[in-house]
Amino acid sequence: KDRLDANAVAAQVPMGAEDNFWGVIDLVTMTAWDFKADEKGMTYPEPMDEIPAEFADIAATKREELLDAAASFDDELMEKILMEEDFTVEELKAALRKGVLANELNLVFVGSAYKNKGVQELLDAVVDYLPSPLDVEAVTGTDPDTGEEIQRHPSFDEPFSGLVFKIMTDPFVGKLTYVRVYSGRAESGSYVVNAS
């Protein structure tokens, strides 16, 4: 929390460190994953039957911190936690997502991209917690023909609008244009007007 100057909460606990890093404990599901060194991250591991005893205490402590953080964003979840009632993983993820979307909670994940350990879990977390295009508010622009201010919502049903943010030439493919699409669809071979 001090280093990041943010409300950082662990979503995972590492098993091992540095060259001896061999697994991850997911605090949302309380599942442990053993990334076998001889597989070099080529296969997705099966969850372990239980959390190893030497990591049980730290996992329980960090899980409590995660639940406290999640409960502050969802009153129903807070009530269930206080009353010691069961709650689902989906309810916990939804509460955590509220905090992340409000930019009031920063979940911390562990892994090694070099050894492909914990990478899939991180990518799953991107889907579970970070904003999707549907969470983004409508963008406002100007109609190039009328000068009228218009809004585009992130929907396939809206007319196409986008922003070219990079153009490059590839020796094998030719000219490549990178576009941030705000609404609609761009079909192959279609013409798009540059309004600027």
Identify the residue ranges that each predicted region occupies.
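Structural and coupling elements of P-loop NTPases
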Residues: 1-196
